Each structure stands twice: as structure tokens, then as C-alpha cells.
């Protein structure tokens, strides 16, 4: 079967790839068809994205020899490390002790190294061509890095300006029409909504392609024109919270199907509360695992509030802890005033207060998670915390260092998504499920709204007071 677009015919160009239209499959088929001895270099943005792409390529039977896949930042690190004299960078930046400043310094050094033109020969000797995935997520310096590589290698960039949602905290994304296409001329657009066709929901896929055009030119989305696969939950004043909770419990139309619940990107606490109240739901975490790192930084085993800190942390990742009641019970048990014997979790908590060690803290967390009726709804955070506590108990690191190490290991894993997951558009972009539930469309830009609506392959649920969704302006 011929490729939908022949990427080998593109010397330098860009492919516009709307959500669910087979971009990853096109990359896989291109790599399968690759016959040269030199591999194709494939760059993307996140370590989780790299892991997911590798897994997809393995499933497609793509031989490892056909490609090298990396993040743009990871490739930049290896590049300047291989040519330190020419790069002239401070070697300390490769240690990533200060990621907020080290990554920009690494990108800047790689950009200058490529712009100097010294690497043309080694790059041509190593790679056949370059493909860059999710190009809309590039900031201007990453765009300059890819532009430098494109001076040497045949290059095709693939992405969708309607999914450019990482433009925050001063991270200026490259503009598709003004900056990408002048350097990488338009070479094609994917137009078949494969995600929905394969799920038997072609009407939904075609509608999403149509509203993409509307959103792109600043028009609203009218849910009254949507196909039957889209369900509008009309929110009523005073009952919005309950209605959203009910919507979050929407079942997938297929057996063992998956549901993505897309909440408010700003109100993280609100998302976690909804996750804790939704049976079977689990939170999708930001890669920085900030709550874990803050807990590790502040947890004082020898402090008077050690049990309170531990219980509060447990309450933030699982249900059924009852932090205040646990502390009261421990005090009663320790003073001999308790009328009922301790539960296993209470017994571990009493032992922890008497001997506040990392091992004891870990036993408390494990016992709380195993209580009848308890449910861990932030498993990633708990897993990394357990891993860090085990490292501390083994004497290999302090808690903060161990937590950061656990986080960095976790960052390189392909994300394992629960059958019912809760997150924001930023956290769920690139993922798909049978059903997407959009809880706060009124807070979304056109790009965020498009990303949210395109996560569900069979069914989309939208909660709003008005059937006409008017995106908010960027910025």
C-alpha cells in the first residue's frame, strides 16, 4: 500500500497533521520502507513521547537499525558533549542540576554549534535524513536547531498548529505560518480521520476536522450541529459541580474501553478532588511531580509533625486516610486511652511515632494504601515516593535527592494510562481514549478546545451552560 504522503520525496518541507489523522503511522510506515544503511533521525519533545514512539515502532515491526529516536533536548546534549571544544559550553550544564537554566543553555550551545557549520560531514555520515514530530511544540531556539540540521540533512517536520498549547511561562512557540513554513514549505496535509474511522465513528472524525477549520479562523463551535457521538451536558446554575461529577463517570460504549476526563488546567487541586471522587479514576501527573518533591523537601522525620506530614501526603494520593482521625487514634493508642484495638495502619503509625525512620514511614504508607475501602488515585506519585523511601532506607541518598532521582527515572518511561484518567489538555495531549469528557470548555483557547475534543475516538461529552462554545483568546 503506498504511503499517504511520500516523505522520502521531501527534501525540506512540512506536513500539517490534524489530530488522529495517522501521523505516527505515517512515520512508522516511512521507517519500514527505509532501505539505506544509515538510519533516519527522528526527533520529538518529551521522553515519554520517545518511549511511546519506540513502542509503536516495535509493534509495527520497524527494525532498530532503521532509525534513531531522541528528544530535541537529548540530541542537543549529546551533540555538544561530543564536540565540547567547538561548542565551548560550560560542562556543568550537562549535569542538569539547574534544569530551568541548563536546558536553555544546552539548546543555545547546540544552536550555535550547528549554525557554525562544522558538523556537516559527521551528520551526513551518520544519518540518512531527519523527521521531527510534534513540530508545533518547538520553541524558537529548538526551531533554530532543526533549521541548522536541515542545512545538512533532508528534513521533514510534522505537526499541527491547532495543537500548539505549550506557549506559557515565556516559552514562545514557533509560528507555523510565519516561521515554520517559510523554512519548511508546505508539502502536504493529512486528511483522513483514521482514529475515528477505525473506531467506527467516521461522522465524529469528519465533524472534528470541520470544527478545526472553524476554530482556526476564530469561529465558535456549535454543539447543536454535532453528530450523535457528541453529548452535550447542559450545566445548570447551582448544580454544575454535581453534573460534572456525573459526567466524569460516563461509561465507554465498548467493553473495557477507556475514558479521558479533561479538567481545568489551572485548578490542579480541583482535578485531584474530582479524581478522588470518581470511582476507578486516576490522575495523570505533570512530569515535575511537584507534590512529591515538595513533600521530600519538607518532610522532617525527627519533627513533632512527622506523622501529620506523612498522613497529609497520603491523603493527597489516596482515599480513606482520614488524617485528622489517624492522628487522634495514634495519640489515644500511645497513651492507653483507646477502647478498640488498632487497625494495621494505626499500628504502623504508632510504631512510626515511636521510631520515625524511612522504613517505618514506608510501612505506614503501604498499610494506609491496603486499608479496606482505600483507593490510590495518584499511583505515579506514590510509586516514586515508595521508591525514594526505599533508597533512603538503603542508605544510598537523602530523601530529596532520592525523590528527584525517582522522578527522573519516571520521566523516561512511557506513560501508563488508567482506563479512567483525569488530567488537563497539557497532560493528555497526544493520548487517545474511547471517550473524552470535557468539563470546562469555557476556559479553553481554540487550540486547547480542539485538543480536548479530539481525545475521544468513539464518544465525546461536553459540559457547558451554552451549546455554543466560544474559545477564550490566547494570553
Language model regions located:
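The feature marks helicase ATPase cores and/or their adjacent C-terminal helical subdomains
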Residues: 1-475
Amino acid at each position: 500500500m503506498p504511503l499517504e504522503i511520500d516523505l522520502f520525496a521531501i527534501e525540506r518541507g512540512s506536513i500539517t497533521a490534524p489530530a488522529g489523522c495517522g501521523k505516527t503511522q505515517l512515520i512508522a510506515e516511512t521507517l519500514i520502507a527505509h532501505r539505506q544503511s544509515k538510519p533516519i533521525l527522528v526527533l520529538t519533545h518529551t521522553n515519554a513521547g520517545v518511549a511511546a514512539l519506540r513502542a509503536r515502532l516495535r509493534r509495527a515491526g520497524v527494525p532498530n537499525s532503521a532509525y534513531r529516536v531522541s528528544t530535541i533536548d537529548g540530541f542537543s546534549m549529546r551533540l555538544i558533549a561530543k564536540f565540547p571544544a567547538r561548542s565551548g559550553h560550560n560542562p556543568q550544564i550537562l549535569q542538569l542540576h539547574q534544569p530551568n537554566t541548563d536546558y536553555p543553555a544546552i539548546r543555545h550551545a547546540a544552536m550555535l554549534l550547528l549554525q557554525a557549520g562544522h558538523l556537516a560531514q559527521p551528520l551526513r555520515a551518520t544519518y540518512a535524513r531527519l523527521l521531527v514530530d510534534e513540530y508545533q511544540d518547538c520553541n524558537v531556539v529548538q526551531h533554530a536547531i532543526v533549521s541548522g540540521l536541515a542545512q545538512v540533512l533532508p528534513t521533514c517536520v510534522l505537526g499541527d498548529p491547532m495543537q500548539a498549547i505549550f506557549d506559557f511561562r515565556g516559552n514562545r512557540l514557533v509560528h507555523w505560518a510565519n516561521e515554520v513554513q517559510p523554512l519548511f514549505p508546505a508539502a502536504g496535509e493529512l486528511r483522513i480521520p483514521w482514529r475515528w474511522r477505525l473506531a467506527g465513528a467516521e461522522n465524529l472524525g469528519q465533524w472534528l476536522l470541520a470544527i478545526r477549520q472553524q476554530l482556526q479562523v476564530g469561529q465558535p463551535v456549535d454543539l447543536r450541529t454535532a453528530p450523535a457521538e457528541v453529548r452535550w451536558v447542559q450545566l445548570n446554575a447551582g448544580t454544575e459541580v454535581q453534573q460534572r461529577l456525573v459526567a466524569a463517570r460516563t461509561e465507554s460504549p465498548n467493553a473495557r474501553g477507556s475514558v479521558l476526563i479533561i479538567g481545568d488546567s489551572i485548578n490542579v487541586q480541583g482535578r485531584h478532588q474530582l479524581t478522588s471522587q470518581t470511582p476507578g479514576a486516576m490522575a495523570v501527573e505533570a512530569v515535575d511531580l511537584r507534590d512529591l518533591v515538595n513533600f521530600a523537601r519538607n518532610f522532617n522525620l525527627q519533627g513533632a509533625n512527622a506523622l501529620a506530614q506523612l498522613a497529609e501526603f497520603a491523603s493527597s494520593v489516596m482515599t480513606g486516610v482520614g488524617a485528622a482521625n489517624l492522628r487522634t487514634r495514634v495519640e489515644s493508642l500511645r497513651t492507653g486511652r483507646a477502647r478498640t484495638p488498632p487497625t494495621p495502619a494505626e499500628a504502623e503509625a504508632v510504631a512510626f511515632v515511636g521510631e520515625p525512620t524511612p522504613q517505618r514511614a514506608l510501612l505506614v504508607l503501604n498499610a494506609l494504601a491496603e486499608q479496606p475501602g482505600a483507593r490510590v488515585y495518584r499511583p505515579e506519585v506514590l510509586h516514586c515516593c515508595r521508591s525514594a523511601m526505599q533508597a533512603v532506607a538503603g542508605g544510598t541518598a537523602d530523601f530529596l535527592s532520592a525523590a528527584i532521582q525517582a522522578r527522573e527515572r519516571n520521566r523516561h518511561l512511557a506513560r501508563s494510562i488508567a482506563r479512567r484518567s483525569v488530567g488537563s489538555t497539557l497532560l493528555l495531549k497526544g493520548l487517545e481514549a474511547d471517550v473524552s469528557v470535557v468539563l470546562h470548555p469555557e476556559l479553553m483557547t481554540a487550540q486547547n478546545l480542539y485538543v480536548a475534543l479530539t481525545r475521544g475516538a468513539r464518544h465525546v461529552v461536553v459540559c457547558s451552560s451554552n451549546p455554543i462554545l466560544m474559545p477564550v483568546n490566547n494570553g
